[in-house]
């Protein structure tokens, strides 16, 4: 089967098969002390993150050094992204996360900034989210790296930031599940769209090949499964 890039995954290195951009956790706060989640989806994801965190500690390898000591511990042959997720953002940890992020982006194995973005269901105030998101836009531009975006109910605010900065680097909306009309709006604004396991078929069908990415994110599926699913929806064959 054709090799396909998994542009955004939370899988461990051993499960990513060496063809993924692994989201590198900036756990400057223990998951036990992260801001309270406002909805069920966030709460479930937070629980899974805590489970992964404890699993890393028990295994004593992989990302454990980074999680325990905030030092870079990547494996040769793998590539990463790092960003300040709005779910994990709070006044008490914002500066620490930013400093840690700036340090990680100096390593060549980091090939993207993110996931970063805006989320009106997150506990962090929107003003703080905007401040930290803009700082990550600046880091994306400084390092010449694409920005992987998390956006929930904040499209207008996101577009306003894009208009303000006029970024030269690619902005990739990850886990896109919107309607075709929203997809067309974002495509006209220069966005790339990344699709995971769930999305409206008609939306996937509207995105041109050159603006389309695929991802596993938190899915149990492999990227090959995501590719085959997308191929069926788009009516093409996988070589």
Predicted regions and their residues:
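Mid-domain alpha/beta scaffold segments of enzyme catalytic cores
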Residues: 1-239
């Amino acid at each position: 089967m054709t090799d396909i890039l998994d542009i955004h995954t939370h899988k461990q290195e051993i499960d990513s098969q060496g063809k993924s951009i692994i989201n590198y956790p900036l756990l400057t706060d223990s998951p036990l002390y992260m801001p309270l989640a406002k909805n069920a989806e966030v709460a479930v994801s937070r629980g899974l993150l805590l489970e992964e965190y404890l699993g890393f500690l028990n295994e004593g390898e992989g990302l454990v050094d980074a999680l325990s000591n905030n030092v870079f511990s990547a494996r040769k042959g793998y590539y990463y992204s790092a960003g300040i997720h709005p779910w994990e953002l709070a006044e008490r940890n914002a500066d620490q996360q930013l400093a840690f992020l700036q340090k990680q982006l100096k390593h060549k194995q980091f090939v993207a900034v993110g996931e970063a973005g805006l989320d009106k269901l997150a506990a962090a105030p929107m003003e703080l989210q905007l401040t930290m998101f803009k700082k990550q836009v600046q880091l994306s531009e400084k390092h010449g790296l694409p920005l992987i975006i998390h956006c929930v109910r904040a499209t207008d605010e996101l577009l306003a930031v894009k208009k303000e900065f006029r970024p030269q680097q690619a902005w990739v909306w990850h886990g896109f599940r919107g309607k075709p009309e929203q997809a067309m709006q974002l495509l006209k604004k220069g966005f790339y769209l990344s699709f995971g396991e769930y999305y409206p078929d008609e939306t996937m069908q509207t995105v041109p090949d050159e603006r389309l990415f695929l991802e596993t994110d938190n899915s149990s599926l492999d990227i090959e499964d995501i590719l085959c699913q997308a191929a069926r929806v788009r009516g093409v064959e996988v070589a």
